[in-house]
Structures are given as C-alpha cells and as structure tokens.
Amino acid sequence: MEAKEKKYGEIEIEKAQLEAWPNPNPERDYMIEITFPEFTCLCPRSGYPDFATIKIRYIPDKYIVELKSLKLWLNKFRNRYISHEAATNEIYQALYDLLKPRFLEVVGDFHPRGNVHTVVRVRSDENYG
C-alpha cells in the first residue's frame, strides 16, 4: 500500500500554533466576538464525530488572537477523541493563557446527538446568566 502524501491543509493544521498579536487599542475596553461554526471532534466513547459552533468573546488587554492561527488550531481537534466539556475548557484555557484578557468567554454549542443538545460555557467571571 502506498503512503498517502499529506495535503497542504493537513500540514498547516498539524503544525498550527495559536499566535498573539499586540492589541492596537489597549487603553480601551472593547469586545471581540469570534464564531467558528464548523468545529469538529470525536466522541471519546463512541468515536462518532461531534459538531459544534464555538463562540469566543473577549475583552483584550495587551494581546489579541491572530485569526488564521485560531482557525487552524481549532481544526486540530477534528481527529481528537475529546468530550464536549474537555474541548470547550481546553479552548478557553489556551486562549486565556496566551492572551491574558480582561474578560473571556468560550461557548461550545454542540449539535444534538441522540436527541441531546449540549451547550458548554466557560467564562472568566462568575456571571453565567
């Protein structure tokens, strides 16, 4: 059997790292909202694919996330066996550690499977309303 040559997109996703850029307006509080509607990962129990929309809201301090790096990094989850809760928390923690924002919220809105719809919300304050 021949070894399959990786496509350029697979290579880019494989080596993806989150990148921080300087905030152009650190003197001001402003909200950045990012939606990633094509998030996928694999159920650690069944191996079936899970699909979600990942919503990220944050008030930056010194840094903002570079969007292409975020897109490629989020795509790294597509072949990982990881629960909804673990995926959402990992995304939150990676962004929090990288950016150290004034506020951060990550929401994993997972498509229903087996008639169950799961929304996981992680945020840097205690207002979960």
From Swiss-Prot:
Alphabetic keyword roster: Cytoplasm, NADP, Oxidoreductase, Queuosine biosynthesis
Pathway entry: tRNA modification; tRNA-queuosine biosynthesis
Single GO MF annotation: preQ1 synthase activity
GO cellular component: cytosol
UniProt-annotated location(s): Cytoplasm
SUPFAM superfamilies linked: Tetrahydrobiopterin biosynthesis enzymes-like
UniProt-listed Pfam families: QueF
This protein's record includes keyword NADP: yes
UniProt-annotated binding residues for substrate: 65-67, 84-85
Active site per the UniProt annotation: 43, 50
Superkingdom of this protein's organism: Bacteria
Reactions catalysed: 7-aminomethyl-7-carbaguanine + 2 NADP(+) = 7-cyano-7-deazaguanine + 2 NADPH + 3 H(+)
One biological process term in Gene Ontology: queuosine biosynthetic process
Family: Belongs to the GTP cyclohydrolase I family. QueF type 1 subfamily.
Function, as annotated: Catalyzes the NADPH-dependent reduction of 7-cyano-7-deazaguanine (preQ0) to 7-aminomethyl-7-deazaguanine (preQ1).
HAMAP family: QueF_type1
Protein name (database record): NADPH-dependent 7-cyano-7-deazaguanine reductase
Species annotation: Aquifex aeolicus (strain VF5)
Gene designation per UniProt: queF
